[in-house]
Amino acid sequence: MSTIEEQLKALREETLASLKQITAENEKEMQDLRVSVLGKKGSLTEILKGMKDVSAEMRPIIGKHVNEARDVLTAAFEETAKLLEEKKVAAQLASESIDVTLPGRPVAAGHRHVLTQTSEEIEDIFIGMGYQVVDGFEVEQDYYNFERMNLPKDHPARDMQDTFYITEEILLRTHTSPVQARAMDAHDFSKGPLKMISPGRVFRRDTDDATHSHQFHQIEGLVVGKNISMADLQGTLQLIVQKMFGEERQIRLRPSYFPFTEPSVEVDVSCFKCGGEGCNVCKKTGWIEIMGAGMVHPRVLEMSGIDATVYSGFAFGLGQERVAMLRYGINDIRGFYQGDVRFSEQFK
């Protein structure tokens, strides 16, 4: 065996032994070893300098051994680098491992908005009384919003409801009454009376302040059937108020005017803060205005093809914001819409 072959064998054995000693923490040591063995001034290059002393017959053989040694050492360095990287990744994963048996961070539970809570409570009251809940369009026709409610185009009461018009005949509804008109059109009175509520968002051209908003929520109710009287309306209103504000509450009806009811009334509830004695909430009167109501105007019935000499009905409407403000002592309607979590969290 020639001297070069012996040197190659010794270099391979020493290098492979050194690679086995290198750990992931000493990766630079492997790079230094690679340069010292395979670099331009490395050990293998020094061995090759002895080729000038090898006979011409032996040079191909020795050259083959040199190439084999270079290939073996190069593969060994690559394999070691791969192993070190795998160990490094494994160590990192181990340090970042998660104990899946540990309890997780609690997820903050959401809750319904106070207006949603109020609406659902009111709807549940009416569902328990046999009413159906009917939804309708927020973008409505002038015909259903006004004319079907006994408000023709030249009616002075239209000035009471400043309206967001999209076109001359299309608008954002100012109340949920159009839902009632469509329901009367579709109802089969041969199967019994119509009892419904129509909750939803409505729009008025009001300037936003503590008690007014350009959008708010209404729940309007309607009952149409045979022999429906003012006494039925009063009894229904009394029951509704007691379920919303407490069994001890009483109501008072005051004459009023609405184009779609005749007679029309404003409904007051006995003050739930002072019990009727008079306080700042009821403005010393002992009563708080809560909703409007009345007997359905015969013209409204007739526009749905209902014989007003046979059928009669009553209607009422109240605002969810109004109910929530009274129940929870809220003094600014804007709080419902500003998205302040501090406000919402009070009503979990």
Swiss-Prot record:
PROSITE patterns, alphabetized: AA_TRNA_LIGASE_II
Keywords (A to Z) from UniProt: Aminoacyl-tRNA synthetase, ATP-binding, Cytoplasm, Ligase, Magnesium, Metal-binding, Nucleotide-binding, Protein biosynthesis
Primary subcellular site in the record, as a coarse category: cytoplasm
EC number: 6.1.1.20
Entries under SUPFAM superfamilies matching the protein: Class II aaRS and biotin synthetases, tRNA-binding arm
Binding-site residues, Mg(2+): 262
Protein family (similarity comment): Belongs to the class-II aminoacyl-tRNA synthetase family. Phe-tRNA synthetase alpha subunit type 1 subfamily.
Catalytic reactions on record: tRNA(Phe) + L-phenylalanine + ATP = L-phenylalanyl-tRNA(Phe) + AMP + diphosphate + H(+)
Name of this chain's protein: Phenylalanine--tRNA ligase alpha subunit
Top-rank EC class of the record's enzyme: ligase
Cofactor: record remark: Binds 2 magnesium ions per tetramer.
Localisation: Cytoplasm
Molecular function terms from GO: ATP binding; catalytic activity, acting on a protein; magnesium ion binding; phenylalanine-tRNA ligase activity; transferase activity; tRNA binding
Names of required cofactors: Mg(2+)
Xref: InterPro entries: aa-tRNA-synth_II (IPR006195), aa-tRNA-synth_II/BPL/LPL (IPR045864), Phe-tRNA-synth_IIc_asu (IPR004529), Phe-tRNA_ligase_II_N (IPR004188), Phe_tRNA_ligase_alpha1_bac (IPR022911), Phenylalanyl-tRNA_Synthase (IPR002319), tRNA-bd_arm (IPR010978)
Keyword Oxidoreductase: no
Oligomer status and interactors: Tetramer of two alpha and two beta subunits.
Protein origin, superkingdom: Bacteria
GO biological process terms on file: phenylalanyl-tRNA aminoacylation
GO CC, any one term: cytoplasm
Coiled-coil intervals: none
Membrane-spanning residues: none
Protein source organism: Streptococcus pneumoniae (strain JJA)
